[in-house]
UniProtKB/Swiss-Prot annotation:
Domain TRAM: 376-441
Protein name per its UniProtKB record: Ribosomal protein uS12 methylthiotransferase RimO
Cofactor binding remark: Binds 2 [4Fe-4S] clusters. One cluster is coordinated with 3 cysteines and an exchangeable S-adenosyl-L-methionine.
Lineage, highest ranks first: Bacteria, Pseudomonadati, Pseudomonadota, Gammaproteobacteria, Enterobacterales
Biological processes per GO annotation: tRNA modification
Encoding gene per record: rimO
């Protein structure tokens, strides 16, 4: 006779950035391990967990709407994530929410689930849960979160008030997770955090251990160890500290992907100072030139904010001049919008919305031209492509220069002999502003 009784069903909604996605995966893995069933619909779930985002106003609105929908469809809702740090704001709109916790409060979330839907009696066959845990990404790539929180106090950002100061995960724990993922068939690891290059600062870069060997808790040491897995390793959210220079040779040697996601935010020294960001465009340009000399295939991704309080036409022109000089490969641009709790809200000379829109359009027009020219240089070359999707019309994948969700794609029209997770060599035949088209070699 089975000792499994009712298997409680949990609905789950995950919003926001990849860092939130990793938190969701951790909660789901624990729930599955304890015998809960995770279901894709609200109506037959015993309760619903909503992992929220609260970074910008549109994300707050999306989170509140998701909570409202879960309440309407199910009625029993637990809220966690970044917006959970603002309990009063949630309760004001949705007073019937069962419980609210802040970000990375895994244990609290599980305690609340146990309270409202007690743990089922079951044989904990952990083999029922994949060794790498429950993943919300395709099987061939995964996010590897190395730390939580941030020590910076950028005036446009409220992340430290939600997620706290930097807390680095033990390097042995990070490397063990990476090994499990690689052993499970993951072909690409995307290293993420609020501030990847600060990894280990909070623990004074102390020595940890992996497989009985000492390893320093630092971004560079982490990259050297991850390189031994023989899979793609991609760095995201890299703050432009001086020691970032030390990972470029690893990229040139093919140990990790020649890809750097380094949010620069602006180029005007005055605006960077108002943002509380490091402030020398000339120094950044010199570093970029040096990086490309060491690693010619380096792909640089960055993000910028236009219309920040106090930004003049002269400041904006400095940003455009920087783009022309830097010729970055992948660029995201945001129109500044006030975020509740951000100190930038108190700055003088807020920029009118129509001016933000006009500057954003000029920025994007210039960067699209640069991006198209950069991609055109790849036509005729052979590149490696990681296949993401295959259907009857062909395959879609990404090159080493393309992170999932945020960058471009490589289209292999008519190529149906491959499967997701395959790495194939492709000759590039056509390019536009964002994407490439090619044929398998």
């Amino acid at each position: 006779m089975s000792n499994v009784t009712h298997q409680p069903k949990i609905g789950f909604v995950s919003l926001g950035c990849p860092k939130n996605l990793v938190d969701s995966e951790r909660i789901l893995t624990e729930l599955r391990t304890e015998g809960y069933d995770v279901v894709p619909t609200y109506d037959n779930a015993d309760m619903v967990i909503v992992n929220t985002c609260g970074f910008i106003d549109s994300a707050v609105q999306e989170s509140l709407e998701a909570i409202g929908e879960a309440l309407k469809e199910n009625g029993k809702v637990i809220v966690t994530g970044c917006l959970g740090a603002k309990e009063d704001q949630i309760r004001e709109v949705h007073p019937k929410v069962l419980e609210i916790t802040g970000p990375h409060s895994y244990e609290q979330v599980l305690e609340h689930v146990h309270h409202y839907s007690p743990k089922p009696k079951h044989n904990p066959f952990l083999s029922l849960v994949p060794e790498q845990g429950v993943k919300l990404t395709p099987r061939h790539y995964a996010y590897l979160k190395i730390s939580e929180g941030c020590n910076h106090r950028c005036t446009f950002c409220i992340i430290p008030s939600m997620r706290g100061d930097l807390v680095s995960r033990p390097i042995g724990e990070v490397l063990a997770e990476a090994k499990r993922l690689a052993d499970a068939g993951v072909k690409e690891l995307l290293v993420i955090s609020q501030d990847t290059s600060a990894y280990g600062v909070d623990v004074k870069h102390r020595t940890g251990f992996h497989n009985g060997m000492p390893v320093k808790t630092s971004m560079v040491s982490l990259c050297e160890e991850l390189a031994k897995l023989g899979i793609w390793v991609r760095l995201h959210y890299v703050y432009p500290y001086p020691h970032v220079d030390d990972v470029i040779p690893l990229m040139a040697e093919g140990k990790i992907l020649p890809y750097l996601d380094i949010p620069l935010q602006h180029a005007s020294p005055r605006i960077l100072k108002l943002m509380k960001r490091p402030g020398s465009a000339d120094r950044q340009l010199a570093r970029i030139k040096q990086w490309r000399e060491i690693c010619p295939d380096l792909t640089l991704r960055s993000t910028f904010i236009v219309g920040f309080p106090g930004e003049t036409e002269e400041d904006f022109q400095m940003l455009l001049d920087f783009l022309k000089e830097a010729r970055l490969d992948r660029v995201g641009c945001f129109k500044y919008s006030p975020v509740e709790g951000a100190t930038a809200n108190e700055l003088a000379d807020q920029v009118p919305e129509e001016v933000k829109e006009e500057r954003w359009n000029r920025f994007m027009q210039l960067q699209q031209q640069i991006s198209a020219e950069r991609l055109q240089e790849k036509v005729g070359r052979e590149i490696l492509v990681l296949v993401d999707e295959v259907d009857e019309e062909g395959a879609i994948g990404r090159s080493m220069a393309d992170a999932p969700e945020i960058d471009g794609a490589v289209y292999l029209n008519g190529e149906t002999r491959v499967k997701p997770g395959d790495v194939v060599r492709v000759k590039v035949e056509h390019a536009d502003e964002y994407d490439l088209w090619g044929t398998r070699v």
